Amino acid sequence: AGFVGDGMLNAAVLGDVFTSPTPDQILTGIQAADQGAGVLLIVKNYTGDILNFEMAKDMADMEDIHVEMVVVDDDIAVEDSTYTAGKRGVAGTVLVHKILGHHARQGASLEELVSLGEKIVSSTKTIGVALKAATVPEVGKPGFTLPEDEIEFGVGIHGEPGYRREKIQPSKELAKELVEKTLSSYEQQPQTVGVLVNGMGGTPLMEQFVFMNDVLTLLEDKGVQVTFHKVGNYMTSIDMQGLSLTMIDLATKDWQTALESNVTTISW
């Protein structure tokens, strides 16, 4: 909801904690956002979300509202997890919101936004790390447990486990693994990137900025130019202690302009 405003989203549809909104709730959001030119749904790749948003899309079609959907699956850590078939949609979704919101404000058609959205998603890669899992309110305990001296690589925003646990490392070592894994996920290493360091909810901003500094140093050493970077809590997981690293290939120059354009939202 913090990304609703001029230049980004027209509406956000929320379900219960770690639960997809219902098709009826989504349809209400579609109706509220519709201004006659159609509605674009930006959906993170979780099984429940995909099913419910597709049902809502069909319901909107019956009301003669033209609806299209872009699915975000930017997480490179794991292919399948508790809530997904395939890669998860995580913090890179925020950059998709920003770039598509800018182009929608510039008058792009629904079909143009769908095509652009698919290109943005394929150019965006994210990986996360956590020191402590989120506490699910209904359960009253963390989704998984970690010894105090361990971290988990590849965690999801719903507390899904990652791909490896090991002893806590200094920020520079964490940055090294995440940067190298992210860059290696591209078919060809990008020359110019935007970087988002996203806090999961329980990580102090100071630690996020230290990590960003380490990331920027590593990318400079690898000859990768960073022309946009942002730090903060943009896609959180309640009280999870951790962060994620997102990179977007900015070979397409107007994406840079889109990321830098002014918006009137609470959270950007």
Say what each PLM segment does.
Residues 72-112, 116-123:
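Short alpha-helices
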Residues 6-36, 183:
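Glycine-rich oxoanion-binding loops at beta->alpha junctions
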Residues 1, 10-12, 38-47, 54-57, ...:
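Short glycine-rich or small-residue beta-strand-to-loop segments that form or flank ligand, phosphate
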